[in-house]
C-alpha cells in the first residue's frame, strides 16, 4: 500500500457579481464547469469544481456573487449560499475587477474580515485597464484594506497568472485523504450540468433582454439504446412576452440555443445527445421560495 502523503482542501471563490469568478474557476480546472456569461448573477448554485494533480486535490466552491440588494427571494437565497460557503474552507480567493471598487466589493470584504481563512486577492481583468498608471495606486489601496495572504493581478480570460494562484492554493492544502476520485471534475450530477449548459446559452443568445427570471428544469435524462442520452429541458419564464423572446421568430432562437447546448453537452458527457426544449410560463417563481426549493435552488444552503 502506498504511504505517499496526499493533500486536500476546500477553496472558496468569492466576489461581487460579474468580476470573473466562474471564468477563473474554469481556467483553474482546465475546463468549463461553471457557467460564464456577461450578465451579473449567472452562477446560482455553489458548483464545486475539483482539480486533482498528483498528491494535491483542490475542491473549489464557486459562490454566487454576494450583492447588496436582497429584495427577491432568489437574491436572498443566493447571498445566503455565498456567505455559507466562506465558512469552512482552507483558503478564500477574493476576485475584484481591475481598478473598480464598489459598495458590493466592500460588503464582500467586510464578510471576509470576519473569517478565519487566509485570503488571496485576485485582481482580474488587469489587461482591460485603460489607464495603466492607475493600477499601482489601486493595488496599494487594496493592500491597505486587509491583510491579504497575497495580491495577484490576473486575467482569468487569457489565463495570465492563473498558475500563480494554483501554486498558492497547492501550498495551502492540508495533508488529508482525497475526497473524490482523481477523474472527478465536479460533484454535481450530469442532469444539473445539462441545466447549467442550457441556462448559459439562454444568457448568451438573449443578452440583456432576458431578465434573471428564467430557469431550466431537466424533466427527462435517460440513456438511450445508442449509448447516448435523451434529454428534455423545460425553460421556465415569468411572462408570455419572455416566452416569445426565448422561442424567437419562427422558433429560430430556441433552435440555436438547443443546437449550441447539445454541442456542449456532447463534449462534456462524451456521448451523443438528443435534446428537446420547451418553454413554459410560471409567473413569479423568483419571488416564491417554495418554488425555488422545488427547482433545486436551496439544496445546499
Swiss-Prot record:
Principal location: cytoplasm
Domain KH type-2: 206-283
Chain sites annotated for binding GTP: 15-22, 62-66, 124-127
Region spans: G5: 154-156
Positions of the UniProt region annotated as G1: 15-22
Domain Era-type G as annotated: residue spans: 7-175
InterPro entries xref list: G_ERA_dom, GTP-bd, GTPase_Era-like, KH_dom-like_a/b, KH_dom_type_2, KH_sf_prok-type, P-loop_NTPase, Small_GTP-bd
Segments of this protein annotated with the region G2: 41-45
Span list, region G4: 124-127
Source organism superkingdom: Bacteria
GO BP, sorted A to Z: ribosomal small subunit assembly
GO terms under cellular component: cytosol; plasma membrane
Record key words, sorted: Cell inner membrane, Cell membrane, Cytoplasm, GTP-binding, Membrane, Nucleotide-binding, Ribosome biogenesis, RNA-binding, rRNA-binding
UniProt cross-references to CDD domains, sorted A to Z: Era (cd04163), KH-II_Era (cd22534)
Record's subcellular location: Cytoplasm; Cell inner membrane
Family matches, as Pfam families: KH_2, MMR_HSR1
Chain segments carrying region G3: 62-65
Membrane topology: Peripheral membrane protein
Family, similarity comment: Belongs to the TRAFAC class TrmE-Era-EngA-EngB-Septin-like GTPase superfamily. Era GTPase family.
Record function comment: An essential GTPase that binds both GDP and GTP, with rapid nucleotide exchange. Plays a role in 16S rRNA processing and 30S ribosomal subunit biogenesis and possibly also in cell cycle regulation and energy metabolism.
Subunit structure as annotated in this protein's UniProt entry: Monomer.
PANTHER family: GTPASE ERA, GTPASE ERA, MITOCHONDRIAL
Protein name per its UniProtKB record: GTPase Era
Organism field: Salmonella schwarzengrund (strain CVM19633)
Gene: era
